[in-house]
């Protein structure tokens, strides 16, 4: 079991503290993403603690645990360990398989609220009904449709598709295939791939023989996506890529840079008022606001804090009852950097509508309605456009 447990403490001994868990894959395929995501969540905790308005001036302790992202059993053990620390709620998990495993073992959760910044939702909906789970990461159903819209907008007539042979890849390719066929785009081939192979030259050769104006890669960058891009470029098979959200991280830009100038992708996110507010908060905290899922991580943490205030208690059941209350209308809109305002309004019995960095709104099933950004690549920077 690869597991770690460590603390970031935002309190003075004069005040009571509330523990909130952060259950991310700090080791494994997304280990380059999760540290900044955790720091972003902790920005919200720090903001609430500094306000001195949370309940009776209580402070937040964040308790981090490593879910690995690849080992469901390790994720379950990490969840048990973090819950044994008496956390009031959890920000996490992130990866689909680990989240499914944790949610399916209801005895682990003991009715504790989990808010995931990233775990895609369709295959988790049935499990959510048994537990208290919300996902700020928008669903693969919407993601596949957005990616199809981008493909059409780029005037791609024929496309080859390769997807990961896991739940994420299977769910996404089903939606994407249906959506692009309705747009009249010809699919030259659909190929699945095993994760984390060292060599994907045979898969790329198959894609090349089928042809196409571009290749859509529906998988994870750290679990084969990087190697597929590299093999495509090295062989001259493709130089234009349509990439799903899990292909996006800074390493992608650092490795390939201008070689992606013809390519496009999507991630969940927003360029609206909330995003601008979050950029200022993140910049002050030394965090890159354009990094994947940092806005969602801040929002997940903020919702837990506001739900505590709305219910007047850090009791687990009280938090669960108040997530929808603080995230959806009606109420005064609250943006990043305005948690003190939100806490004050709630203390006075007023209603709030937490808009956050990512236009937070949930269905009754706990699914994010969400918004998306189209990505283009310019050197080692992402260029974003609201979809």
Which residues are covered by each model-predicted region?
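Bacterial N-terminal signal peptides
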Residues: 1-10
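Extracytosolic ligand-binding ectodomains
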Residues: 6, 15-387
